Amino acid sequence: TYKIDKISLENIPKTGRVIFVANHPLGGLDGLSVLRLISSVRTDVKILANVYLKKIEPIKDMFIGIDNLTNLNTKETLKSIITHIENEKAIIIFPAGEVSRTKNFKVQDGAWRDGFLKFAKKTRAPIVPIFIGGKNSPLFYLASMINRPLSGLLLGHELFNKRDKFINIKVGEMIPYENLNLGDFSNAEVANLMKKHIYSLKKDSKGIFKTQQILIKAQDPNALADEISRGEKLGFTRDNKGIYLCETKEYSPLLLELGRLRELTFRSVGEGTNRRYDIDKFDLYYKHLVLFDDEKREIIGAYRLGITDEIAPEINSEKLYTQTLFDYGAGSEFLFSNGVELGRSFVQPKFWGSRALDYLWIGIGAYVKKYPSTRYLFGPVSISVSYPRPARNLIIY
C-alpha cells in the first residue's frame, strides 16, 4: 500500500504525453505501487520494466519489456516507447535500471542511465519526478555487499515481507522538456542532476530544475455559459460567436477558466507564471471582454479592461495593472478619466490562425461605440524573447 498527499496527486497530469521518472529503492513493489498510483489517474500508462515482468498475466499489457542487465534493447522496443509517448500517453521509467543499494551508509540508486532524457527530447515530452521512500531488509543489503547477483535472488522475499507496510510516494511538479537543456552539460550529467532533483523531494527541498504546476481542470461548460450569459452582450460575429463584457468579483468558473486558458496560452509561447492558473488581484475588479462560442460553450479568447472612471486611480496608486509596471509621471492624469486600460489578452492555441484576435478588436470597437465617452485606450504589450533582437528593436518606439 502507498501513501500520497494531495499536492502530489495534483502534480499528476491527467492528459497529454508525459514521462514519469522515479528512484528505485525496493526493486519490485515500488514499481507496482507507482503503476497502481498513476493508473488510478489515467489508463494509458505503461511502465518500462524487466522483460521477465511481462509474464505477470493480469498486468502484462501495462509493461514495455527492456533488458536491464545488458542494456541491449531492440530498435522495435525503442520505437514502441517513442510511439507510445507521441500518442499523448504516459510512461514510467526507473533510470537506475536496478534496485537501490547502500553507498556511504545511505540507501540510494546507482548511476542513472540517460535514456529517459533522450526520450523526452525526442518526443518533446515533460518529465514528472517521483520520489519513492522505502528500504529493503538489512539481509538484502548485507547480501549486496557480499555477492551482488545473490542479492537479486532475495528480491522475491523482499516483495512479500512488506505486507501491512506503507510506501511513501511524492510526486513533484512537472519539468518541461525545454528546461532539460543545460548548455554544455552532457546527458549523463543532466541525468545525475535529475537524480538529485528527485531525492530533494524527500525533504521538500528546492529542486534543481525549473518546474511548472499542472493546470487546473477545465471548468464546467454549462456553468461557464450560464455565467457569461449574465454579462453584457456587445454583439455577435458573422459566424455567430458571442462577444460579452463580464465581471468576475470572485473566483467563479469564468475567472478560473480565464486564468487556466491564459496560462495555457502563455506557456505555448515560452512564457506564463508556471502556476496552476494565471489570475491576479486586478481580475476581481477589472472587466473581461470574452469571445465565446455559445454552441460549443467554449471561451475562444479574451481581453481584460480596466475602466478608469470606475477604478479611479491616482498618480501614485497601484489601482491599475500598468502602475505596477510603469511610473506615471505628472501630466499623465488625463488617462485616468474616460480611459480604458487594455491587457492580458489571449487567444487559446487551438484557435490560432482564425479571426479570433480580429473579433476581440471588433469587441473593443463595440464597447467604444456603446460608451462614446471613452477617449483613451492604453496598456502594456509583451514582446516574446523568441523574436530576434533587431525585430524587437523595430517594434519598440
Per-region residue spans from a language model:
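A short, well-structured juxtamembrane/interface segment
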Residues: 2-18
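Acyl-donor binding region in acyl/amide transferases
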Residues: 273, 309-397
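Short amphipathic alpha-helix that is part of the acyltransferase structural core
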Residues: 234-278, 284, 288, 292, ...
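Secondary-structure boundary elements
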Residues: 40-44, 83-90, 121-126, 268, ...
